[in-house]
């Protein structure tokens, strides 16, 4: 099976980290984010993966050239933003059979093998994974028939107007004939394609339970780290009192809660809660970090107090710095 991974965004909500590294290559515990996505695939069924990339494409190509994977990887560049539909259409030359599409910043418990099986059994043009949420207002909502056919889409409805709590969960199985329906140029798969075929009974919904996390913002990045950690999606590092700690770290007299510390970090006499600290960073004594992301090779001075901050790579923060929200340095 051929797989398209949608990874064309700039990752602007994770800036300034993404000014150094494209979002697919940001470290998620002991692997990159895009490798976490590839780990979801049924390896025995996959022979080709196409990464639909739009930002720092050469970095992504170089990374995959040095990976030993059991399938071919092609990095297909977007010269301009194409939307979900345009990005898929841009990969058409590599598609010759039923294919899978998955968002490149998604960690999910969906059983992709079962999704593929149900799709092939149904004979429809498109099948999409569906996840039930309490608040559907940030998502595309679907209406299902009793036999799990999708008959209607509703994009980001008001809570009182939503006709269900089932949302599009970012994993699709499609037939190549879908390309005949796609308009030219940039377009949305959800708004411009699925809305055309759903009323014709050509779409299947596949509900699943468990988790569905998209690592697009600092809070959801932390949630994705937490999900990978709890689900044991890591092979190096250690579990230290329910915190993930990478190799060769020196952590002295520090209280840590629900945090993720990458390789070669030094933390002295500080309080770290619900935070992610990337490799080769130093946190000096007396500092307090909460819901904070610290980039690689950063140095946090003594007695700093940070909450809901994203700290840039290579930053040097002076002693006593206090900040709530935003980026450091301020940009």
Where are these regions (language model features)?
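N-terminal glycine-rich phosphate-binding loop and ensuing alpha1 helix
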Residues: 1-61
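Conserved beta-loop-beta/alpha segment of the NTase-like Rossmann-fold superfamily
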Residues: 60-146, 183
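Catalytic-core segments of class I nucleotidyltransferases/pyrophosphorylases
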Residues: 99-100, 107, 113-120, 134-136, ...
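C-terminal accessory/binding modules appended to enzymatic or scaffolding proteins
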Residues: 245, 250-269, 273-278
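Short internal beta-strands
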Residues: 50-54, 129-130, 293
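Long, charged amphipathic helices and adjacent flexible linkers at domain junctions
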Residues: 229-250
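Glycine-rich hexapeptide-repeat left-handed beta-helix
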Residues: 93, 265-331
